[in-house]
């Protein structure tokens, strides 16, 4: 049985009907509220404040007022805030994981991963203030010339429901660590995992008032955040359709924007692959967190000589993976996040079968629980081949030559993650180097991310930037060139 002891970060009295931040860094009543529904049980888990554009306008102004003092704080003092926030996430992790599992519908192992990665991101952020912040440049005698990293000012963060804690913290931590203030708008379906747990941790860690504002909201709040005059950068993680709107709106105001969007990711299985290993990787990539991951294995492109046997083994796994309430700690898959998303998944499966795909397993659901589904004979032009599904669907397409596998993998507007499994690493690498994706994994599946790697996609998967690891300084600061003369000199004018 999961540990259900109370955790100080889980405080319903703090966030019930409230938002976080303001000028004094406290919880304050919102004009509107929203129920948070547990996907597995359909029961109300919490009731939180819901931000509207006027709330966003106040929050961005308050963040802008607090930012200069935060950026000027001694580096060691800023670093200590992140270490204390990390310690808050490292305490009673089982209780945090259980809450995240209930709010997101993800299994406990996934929730435990979120808590651990959030703490790691904070530890990494603690090192940012103590790193070199610039370069000394060549200059003529009597003149000092250097370039330094300076914060954008206020960074607006819009985060999704699927991995809410990690995908919020991935932007919040480095943005704060580089001297910015942050206004965070988590998805209103997962406002606690994606926002208020972070607020509680930084509140406990002693982050100065006003530097972090957390306001769950809908699309109107997101648009207000993008357009707010005080916001210098937007970090958005979510669907390509929503990201395109964010990018267009940010472009009108000439704002920097980081877009981490969807994917249609291919796993290529070569004819010399170990099929037990390949089936295990394909199942994880397609079914983990019910396929609600931007890196999910949306296509399994298998050599024709092994496609039937790989399908058989994948079907066997799909039929035996337990589906149910993730809070039980005994299931491999939980629920889809909401009914609209479930119907979208089912519509893609049905349309693909009508177009000639073979339903080998699954394709059924009860409430929000969609069975792991295997489709074979999937071809280009079918919805299961072309579209991001965001559900637990393994779509298998055969190929005859390596060139055909490459062409099938690249036949998409997305470009996030690809993987190749085979006995010959040289052959797998030769294929991988011709795949158009931001992430490439050899002898692994497509779902992989660590705190230290640059993460970003091509095409419709993003705007060709990256976040994480060495990319964060580039994303959350900008260069300022500074020259200094001891005495002002005359000019030709």
Task: Describe the role of every protein-language-model region.
Residues 133-277, 399:
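Rossmann-like NAD(P) dinucleotide-binding subdomain of oxidoreductase/dehydrogenase enzymes
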Residues 41-47, 231, 268, 322, ...:
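Conserved C-terminal structural/oligomerization subdomain of aldehyde/semialdehyde dehydrogenase
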Residues 45-51, 66-72, 157, 267-269, ...:
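Short, well-ordered beta-strand elements within core beta-sheets of diverse protein domains
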Residues 36-40, 61, 258-261, 290-294, ...:
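Short, flexible turn/loop "capping" segments at secondary-structure junctions
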Residues 1-143:
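N-terminal Rossmann-like NAD(P)+-binding subdomain of aldehyde/semialdehyde dehydrogenases
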Residues 241-379, 442, 491-492:
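ALDH superfamily catalytic-core signature
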Residues 67, 71, 86-93, 97, ...:
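Structural signal for hydrophobic packing residues in well-ordered secondary-structure cores
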Residues 42, 78, 100, 122, ...:
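Residue-level signal for inorganic ion chemistry
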């Amino acid at each position: 049985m999961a540990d259900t002891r109370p955790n100080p970060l889980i405080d319903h009295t703090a966030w019930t009907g409230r938002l976080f931040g303001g000028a004094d860094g406290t919880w304050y009543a919102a004009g509107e509220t929203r129920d948070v529904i547990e996907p597995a049980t359909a029961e109300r888990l919490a009731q939180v404040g819901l931000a509207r554009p006027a709330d966003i306008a106040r929050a961005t102004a308050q963040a802008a007022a607090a930012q200069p003092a935060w950026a000027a704080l001694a580096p060691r003092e800023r670093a200590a805030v992140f270490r204390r926030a990390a310690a808050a996430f490292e305490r009673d992790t089982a209780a945090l994981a259980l809450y995240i599992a209930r709010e997101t519908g993800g299994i406990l192992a996934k929730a435990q991963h979120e808590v651990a990665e959030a703490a790691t991101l904070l530890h990494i952020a603690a090192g940012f203030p103590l790193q070199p912040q610039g370069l000394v440049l060549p200059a003529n005698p009597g003149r000092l010339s250097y370039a330094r990293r300076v914060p954008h000012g206020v960074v607006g963060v819009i985060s999704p429901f699927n991995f809410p804690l990690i995908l919020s913290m991935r932007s919040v931590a480095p943005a704060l660590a580089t001297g910015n203030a942050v206004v965070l708008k988590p998805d209103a379906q997962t406002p606690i995992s994606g926002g208020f747990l972070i607020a509680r941790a930084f509140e406990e860690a002693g982050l100065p008032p006003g530097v972090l504002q957390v306001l769950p909201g809908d699309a109107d709040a997101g648009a207000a955040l993008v357009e707010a005059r005080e916001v210098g950068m937007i970090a958005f993680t979510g669907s390509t359709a929503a990201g395109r709107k964010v990018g267009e709106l940010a472009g009108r105001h000439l704002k920097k924007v980081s877009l981490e969007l969807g994917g249609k990711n291919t796993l290529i299985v070569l004819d010399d692959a170990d099929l037990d290993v390949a089936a295990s990787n394909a199942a994880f990539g397609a079914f983990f967190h019910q396929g609600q991951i931007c890196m999910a294995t949306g296509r399994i492109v298998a050599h024709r000589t092994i496609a039937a046997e790989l399908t058989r083994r994948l079907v066997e796994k799909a039929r035996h993976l337990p589906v149910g309430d993730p809070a039980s700690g005994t299931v491999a898959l939980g629920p889809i996040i909401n009914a609209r998303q479930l119907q979208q998944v089912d519509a893609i499966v049905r349309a693909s079968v009508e177009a000639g795909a073979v339903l080998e397993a699954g394709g059924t659901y009860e409430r929000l629980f969609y069975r792991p589904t295997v489709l074979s004979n999937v071809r280009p032009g079918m919805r299961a081949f072309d579209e991001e599904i965001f559900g637990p669907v393994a779509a298998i397409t055969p190929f005859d030559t390596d060139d055909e596998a490459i062409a099938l993998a690249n036949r998409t507007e997305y470009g996030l993650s690809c993987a190749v499994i085979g006995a010959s690493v040289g052959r797998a690498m030769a294929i991988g180097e011709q795949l158009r994706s931001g992430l490439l994994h050899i002898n692994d599946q497509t779902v992989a991310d660590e705190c230290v790697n640059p993460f970003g996609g091509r095409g419709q998967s993003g705007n060709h930037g990256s976040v994480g690891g060495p990319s964060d300084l580039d994303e959350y600061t900008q260069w300022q060139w500074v020259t200094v003369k001891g005495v002002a000199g005359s000019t030709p004018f």
